[in-house]
Regions:
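Short Pro-Gly-centered beta-turn/loop motif in secreted/extracellular proteins
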Residues: 66-74
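Extended beta-strand-rich segments in extracellular/periplasmic secretory proteins, especially
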Residues: 223-274, 278-286, 320-321, 326
Length: 422
């Protein structure tokens, strides 16, 4: 009998609550965001129903949907924004009846910025980063906030085979910024699937994904894993051309670990609002290339006869301003690695990904009991139900799946329904 080994992996940085509804009825709009100059789909575009905290993001194909209360007026405004582009505002009535096959095409226009180079150089990049971090309490909520979020995680083998896929609506008690309190997270409802077969000799299990996605909140956690007073000892900074997000100008600072450091740190970019000095976005990658010891950061348990090499580890976290404060809005983590059994010439390539979109928030946080909290040691697969219901999400906003993922979900639902009828 062929033995199947197990690999347990976590996406670490080095080491919604679901509102009760009196009625399930909702209305829905669909759109596709593209670059107005090139026609290419735009990932991570932010879509918000003005005057509310209801929001979502576009997927890799630019597609999004947004659910809202049926009593919302048809002339209510929807804003669509993306870093480096002018924000566009539409009416709900502009979208027409919901049609996922023919969504409204929304073209965002790139915004170029011409600044005096001397003005850019006037901002010392290291001082700019420190100024932004020192202003965390002024720019982010300093009290508990309740949030609703959609979360998705998956493990993929090669380019097409999804080994596991889990999705959930989360209840979140977001802890105050500038405090040492931890965010509390609970699963309101979720679904998942595993797709291993007799050809798979390695089970890749993803532990702590929900907790880890909150640990990359760079406005709350130590910046790139180092304390405030150590930043300039570990990192070097460089000013980059500024960008616009709608009508907001953002300073851009790139960073990388200093040469000669033995430990693995990060490189990336920080986007800082020019008026408030709030951190609006962070894009970063762990410097794992060519480092055999990178596996020790991510792998919790692995078979002794298997070599593990981390190829890349990428992170994105985005914030959005609401009434003078900036809120955790979207985050994504993705690690790519390859494995090879001892004395084997063949390699297997894997991708582990998780992403979260905050779809609503309010001042009163949910009560999440200790026994219901998601903990780092938890595996989402063990906490969610199967993909049996095509209308599983009801009136909750979710990140629309890319076409390849959507096809997988449809297939899973069909297979499970067929199995239940047998």
């Amino acid at each position: 009998m062929k033995r199947t080994a197990t690999l347990l992996i976590a996406l670490l940085l080095a080491l919604p609550f679901a509102l009760a509804q009196e009625s399930p009825d909702y209305l829905q709009i669909a759109g596709k965001v593209i670059d107005g100059a090139t026609g290419k789909p735009m990932h991570y575009a932010s879509i918000t129903l003005a005057g509310t905290n209801i929001s979502n993001v576009s997927n890799a194909e630019g597609f999004f949907s947004l659910k809202y209360h049926p009593k919302t007026l048809p002339d209510a405004l929807v804003t669509v924004s993306h870093l480096g582009y002018a924000t566009i505002t539409l009416k709900l009535s502009d979208f027409g009846p919901y049609d996922s096959e023919h969504p409204l095409t929304i073209r965002l226009i790139p915004v170029s910025i011409n600044l005096d180079p001397a003005l850019i150089r006037a901002h010392d990049p290291a001082e700019l980063i420190l100024a932004a971090l020192y202003r965390i309490k002024q720019n982010y909520p300093t009290k508990h906030i309740g949030m609703t979020a959609f979360y998705r995680e998956m493990v993929k083998k090669g380019n097409t085979k999804y080994l596991t896929m889990n999705e959930a609506i989360l209840d979140i008690d977001k802890a105050p910024y500038g405090s040492y309190q931890n965010d509390r997270i609970g699963i309101y409802k979720g679904r998942g699937s595993q797709n291993y077969d007799s050809t798979d000799t390695l089970f890749v299990k993803y532990q702590g994904g929900v907790v880890s996605i909150f640990q990359i909140d760079q406005a709350k956690e130590p910046f790139a894993t180092v304390s405030l007073n150590e930043i300039t000892h570990f990192y070097e900074f460089k000013s980059e051309p500024s960008e616009f997000n709608g009508d907001r100008m953002l300073y851009v600072v790139s960073f990388n670990q200093k040469p000669g450091l033995d430990e693995i740190y990060f490189r990336g970019k920080v986007f800082i609002d020019s008026e408030s000095l709030a951190i609006g976005r962070v894009e970063m990658a762990m410097n794992v290339e060519g480092r055999e010891d990178a596996a020790d950061i991510f792998v919790i348990k692995r078979p002794n006869d298997t070599r593990f090499e981390v190829k890349s580890a990428d992170y994105v976290v985005n914030y959005k301003p609401v009434d003078g404060k900036w809120y955790y809005d979207y985050a994504k983590m993705e690690i790519k690695f390859e494995t090879r059994k001892r004395r084997s010439l063949f390699k297997n390539h894997f991708t582990v990904m998780s992403e979260i979109a905050i779809t609503d928030h309010q001042e009163n946080p949910p009560k999440i009991d200790s026994d219901a909290r998601v903990k780092f040691r938890d595996q989402m697969t063990e906490k969610v139900s199967a993909f049996t219901d095509g209308n599983f999400w009801e009136n909750y906003n979710v990140i629309e799946p890319d076409a390849s993922i959507e096809a997988i979900i449809r297939r899973i639902v069909r297979q499970l329904k067929k199995h239940n009828l047998e």
